[in-house]
Every structure is written in C-alpha cells, then in structure tokens.
C-alpha cells in the first residue's frame, strides 16, 4: 500500500506523506529533560495528536510515558471526585493493558484495575499517592500526557485535578513525581479557568500557573512543505517545481497543517481523476526516466484552493460556530476585513487572544491580521453571502459578468466604471456614514459575483483591488 496525504486523525510516517517534525520533537524533549510542565495549545487540526503520538514513539526508550485522552468522556465522569478519579484510573489501566507503556509491576497493574471499578471510591489523595508509586518504582523518568483537555473545560473536578498535579510539582524535590506533565488542547489552561468561573475576580486564577511557555512553532514552513513534496515526487514520479509549489501552498495557508495537507490531497485526487477520465490528461512520459508521471503546476494548486474554499469540513464548521459564539471576535474580524481598521495587537485583549488561539488571527507587525489567505477568503465569502440575495448590485454584476473577463484576465477598469454607475444609481442618495461603513463590502459583493466560478481572489489591502489578474 503506497502512502497518501492525510487529513483525518493521526498521521503515520509509514502510511502518510508528512512534514519531518524531528526538530519539533527535539525541542519538546528539551522541555521534558528540564522537568517542565507545559500545555501544547494550538488550533484545531494543527497536528497535536500526531506530535504526541510520535513523541511517545520516539522517546519510549528514555522515558516511561503514560498518554491518555479525555476525548469522549461523558458528564458522569466529572459528577464528583470519586467518579473522576475512577475514570483516570481506568484510562491509565488501558495504557497498561494494551502495553502502551512498559515496566509496570503487578502491584501497580492490580491496584490500577481495582480503583477503576464502579464500586471503588478513590479520591485525589489516593490518586496522588498512586502517581508517586508509579514514579518511585519506574526505572526511567515518567512523563504524563493528557490530550483533549478542552473536553474537561467546564468541569470543576478537572481543575481540582490540575491543582493536585500542581501540588506534586511543588513538592518534587522531596517526593517522587513526574519528570514532566504535558497537556494538549486548543485552549490554554488559563482560558479553561475563564470558561468556568463566573466572577471577574477569579478569571485568571488558574492552578496551572506552574506551566512553562510552549514556544515550539508547529506550523509548516515552505522548507517543511518542500520536504514532504520531495518525498511524494520521488515516490509517484510527479513533475513539479518543488520550491515554487511549496511556496505557493504556504502563501495561501500560512503553514496551517490541515490546510497544507488538504490542498496536497485535493491536488493529487484531481490529477488521478483527470488521468482516468481523459486520455489527453493521462500521465505523460518522463523523458529522463522513461516512466509515466503526473505534473503539478500553479493552476492545479489554485484549483485545489478553490475546491477547498467551497467545501464543508470540520475546520470551517468549527470556525462558523466559534464566530457565532463570540460576537467580540466576529466584530474584530469584520472591522479588519470591511473597514480596513488597523487594530493594535494586544495579547491581553480577550477577543484577540481567542482569535489567535483558534488560529484565525495573527500578530503582523504589531497589528491584528487574519492568519492566512484561505481563512481570509472563507471569511469574506461567509460575510458577503449574508445579504447577497438582497443586493441589487450583485444582480447587475451577475447579469453582465461575461463582459468583464477575457482569456482569464479581469478588466478592472471596466469593472470600476460599471460599478460606479450602478452604485450611484442605487446608493447615490445614501448618507456618507453609510458609504464609509458599507462601501467596501458592497464593492466586494459586486466583484465576487463577477469572478465567482472563474478564479480565486484574496485581498491584501484596499489598494490591491486595482490588480488586474485573476488567480
């Protein structure tokens, strides 16, 4: 079975085309060796699970690793201290039973199983002593990993559990405990506390203030993407300018792992489908090797971008939900996109911090910006579609769209000329405040109807509306 590009769940090096993350793993190992407790909080589908899995695989000979996940735990697991501790015992026993860790004595195995049973009543002190026993008996430093901590975001028992881990960290010089504890999820633990506490005075009173800052860059650089494409090119005999294609993918994705892999996946699928449906599009002969090969070029990547922007997936669905849940974040993005507002970047501003944490916003030269072209265009499409059915200008653009595009080139001068005529007819009597607030949005609705289905667009600044080429 040959390798594939993958966007669903874990990636395995022997099954999937992947970016080489050894340098990230070594940076994480440094944190572990230094005895740090930390949180890998990154946006959805940012490679957290794969990183944790490869971390456990790569360093299992140096550390005894217990890796559990709170994904899928029901509310009954958090209803009281006993229920929560029983569940943690159960998750630990699964790790032992399936031999995902080594060097576990019969005493620990038996005790772990006994405390996971429904009639057991373990509390946090019992669990803390059990952790100490594991660490005391282990011949290697013990690392404790908890994935999907967001699943416990609204549960007081989880924060009490963090408090117990903090207490063990503070007493690490006198009592056996973990070398390192790694939590993983979208939210920082400080934000988990914020979601639970209702009183403003305790919003940031997190028991996880012992955590070291996690500074590892998990996005993909053009060099990272090029390395993955090189492996693919060698395996499949694809003809492409690797550096140029890698840079183009990066330009649209900002190195967001899911977006990078999805564009590659869509490009590969389209090439395979095209070769099967059309003789003329079948793989051509590679003159150097004499074998048959595909070819990737700029238009293939842009077609994949267009397809990605038009599909429903869990990442975009989650984006819509997050924006619906946070009106402050939604308003900031609207101001940036449609008003061109320059908002100073401040990590202390809750809505900005939330947008960065979700992967939608970034700090660009001290100002808040949308993190990549894919997200920016998807957000434009989302907002522009809200009232498009009621917009008369959109109708006029749709009816006359053929006159604006010749051989893939957008006649921007004609677009502006016709727009001003129609805009004056429809909105000429509007107040200046309306025009200032909504003018850019109205123009983008007009422009979108013209290029819809013909090309892609992205907007770097208001001045870029003068560009003539469709991409």
Identify what each model region corresponds to:
Residues 60-75:
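Conserved catalytic segments around the Walker B and adjacent sensor/switch elements
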Residues 1-59, 129-133:
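Walker A/P-loop-proximal flanking segment of P-loop NTPase domains
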């Amino acid at each position: 079975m040959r390798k594939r590009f993958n966007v669903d769940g874990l990636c395995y090096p022997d099954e999937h085309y992947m970016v080489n993350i050894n340098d990230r793993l070594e940076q994480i190992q440094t944190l572990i060796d230094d005895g740090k407790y930390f949180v890998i909080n990154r946006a959805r589908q940012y490679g957290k699970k794969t990183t944790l899995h490869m971390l456990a695989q790569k360093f299992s000979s140096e550390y005894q690793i217990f890796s559990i996940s709170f994904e899928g735990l029901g509310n009954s697991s958090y209803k009281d201290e006993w229920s929560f501790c029983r569940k943690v015992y159960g998750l630990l026993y699964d790790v032992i039973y399936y031999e995902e860790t080594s060097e576990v004595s019969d005493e620990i195995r038996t005790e772990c199983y006994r405390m996971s049973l429904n009639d057991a009543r373990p509390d946090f002190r019992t669990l803390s002593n059990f952790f100490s026993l594991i660490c005391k008996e282990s011949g290697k430093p013990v690392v404790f990993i908890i994935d999907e901590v967001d699943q416990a975001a609204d549960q007081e028992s989880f924060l009490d559990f963090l408090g117990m881990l903090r207490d063990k960290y503070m007493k690490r010089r006198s009592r056996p405990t973990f070398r390192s504890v790694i939590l993983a999820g979208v939210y920082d633990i400080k934000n988990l506390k914020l979601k639970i506490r209702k009183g403003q005075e305790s919003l940031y009173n997190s028991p996880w203030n012992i955590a070291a800052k996690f500074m590892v860059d998990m996005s993909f650089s053009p060099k990272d993407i090029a390395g993955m494409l090189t492996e693919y090119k060698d395996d499949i005999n694809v003809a492409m300018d690797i550096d140029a294609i890698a840079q183009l993918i990066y330009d649209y994705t900002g190195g967001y792992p899911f977006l990078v892999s999805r564009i590659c996946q869509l490009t590969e699928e389209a090439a395979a489908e095209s070769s099967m449906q059309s003789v003329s599009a079948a793989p051509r002969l590679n003159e150097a090797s004499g074998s048959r090969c595909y070819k990737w070029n700029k238009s293939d990547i842009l077609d994949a971008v267009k397809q990605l922007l038009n599909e429903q997936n869990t990442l975009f669905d989650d984006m819509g939900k997050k924006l619906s849940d946070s009106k402050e974040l939604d308003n900031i993005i609207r101001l940036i996109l449609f008003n061109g507002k320059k908002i100073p970047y401040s990590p202390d501003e809750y809505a900005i911090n939330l947008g960065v944490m979700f992967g939608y916003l970034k700090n660009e030269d001290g100002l808040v910006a949308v993190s990549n072209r894919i997200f920016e265009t998807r957000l434009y499409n989302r907002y522009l579609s809200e009232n498009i059915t009621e917009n008369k200008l959109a109708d006029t653009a749709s009816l006359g769209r053929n006159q604006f595009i010749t051989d893939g080139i957008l006649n921007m001068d004609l677009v502006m000329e016709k727009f001003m005529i129609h805009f004056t007819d429809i909105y000429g009597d509007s107040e200046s405040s309306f025009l200032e607030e909504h003018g850019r949005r109205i123009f983008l609705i007009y422009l979108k109807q013209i290029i819809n289905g013909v090309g892609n667009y992205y907007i770097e600044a208001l001045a870029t509306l003068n560009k003539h080429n469709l991409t």
